[in-house]
Amino acid sequence: MGAFFDSILRPLELAVAYIMVGFHSAFSTIGMNPGSGWTWALSIVGLVVVIRILLIPLFVKQIKASRGLQLIQPQMKAIQEKYKGKTDQASRQAMSQETMALYRETGTNPLASCLPILLQSPVFFALFRVLNGIGQGKTIGPLTDKLVAQADAATLFGAQISDTFIKADTTATRVLTVVLIILMSATTFTTQRQLMMKNMPASALDNPFAQQQKILLYVFPLIFAVSGVNFPIGVLIYWLTTNLWSMGQQFYVIRNNPQPDTPAYAAWEARQAAKRAKKNGGVDPEAPTQTIV
């Protein structure tokens, strides 16, 4: 099983190493210190940028899938109410069939909303293995002995980017890990809350999907706290950067392409009306006219 896992991750590890070394060379060329932790940290940020740009088409699909799931929640609730209290196999099978039929009729795919996260997971683990290897002095692809030694010695605020909270011998690593985990939790909370408060119809706030989102608001910080202490500083930098990208990307989408019947959509309509009025001397040509009797 371990050999199979290695064979899957090996190409991704090589890709991660080449991208990091490419950015490291570019930053070194423009005058940054090759041995600086900032140079290696920015190389990890560059890796995030490359991955997230490649995932933009899937992000668009994710948005459509999420909206589709929100729109069919009333029908989903009706199906659930229809079979409420029925636990026999025939009823459960019938409910499953009706749910799948609803997905087919509306062209909704629940898995599409998870694709960006699922596809990022292998890259995340590949980066973990590369940084873990750096800490052990292992070379891979373009990461030569010289670069591995350089990356292993590189520090950020006194913490080595290949070090972890659990294995750390310095207070700097522990403090930086805690700060990064807090920032990761804050960005995730902000992103989820932004989605729920601004881009979900009032009618959808009481459905199971919305309830799950509310629970995740408080579960994610616990997940970060438990798992984050096991990951190298460099992986936490990757995690925080991708969280910031997600937050900014979602802000752009909510502002420019909001879900109908939401506070974000009302704000978007108000901005559009203001733009039309500005072009027409302060009068919105699409505003409803009042009839004087």
Where are the model-predicted features located?
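Helix-loop-helix
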Residues: 1-293
